[in-house]
Amino acid sequence: SRRSEVRRLLPIFRGAVAALIRQHPALRVVVPTVSAVESQVRTTVADWPGKPIIVGPKAATATWTHTQTLAHLVETAHSDKRAAFAAADVALAASGTVSLELAAAATPMVIAYDMAWLSRQIISRMLRVDTVTLVNLVSETRVVPEFIGANCRPDKIVPALCALLSNPEAQHSAMQRTMAKLGQGGTKPGIRAAQATLSGLGASNGEG
């Protein structure tokens, strides 16, 4: 469930944030959330270093870009996640469709996800590809770092985040390619995403 994901991932993300802030003291942390887990997220991150800005599910009317500051988010905390994505220099996100949303906002990202031990064992035996990140699959690249299962640890995540802060253009081409593929034709976006992902899976397995 989404609540169990929050319980499992946020302590790991907290460790990553704490280490990152030690290296980048001026960093401001923004945590977008949805209504189903907003209360849980607010409680969990209340003692995080850097006093994270919680972005609730209420929609913002403004359109944001990377050139703008986080001042409005600090003042209101009611902007939607798209505004937070667009204003961010780098994102740490769970695996899933959020990587496509970040790519649409041109936000460099690191993907991290953990699961219960039994789920790890089952999935590791079934997985036929070397990446689960949609941007990697759709763009047929491996430029988005991912830390899954036993690798979902702050000491592994933080160097990848620091590398992106130093070189934010590293994923630009892959994100552009992903959006180009998902934007082609008149098919509904969800179907295009599924088709592009299946195509990427086939390419990764040498099928065609």
Regions inferred by a protein language model and the residue ranges of each:
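Nucleotide-activated sugar donor-binding and catalytic core shared by glycosyltransferases
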Residues: 1-208
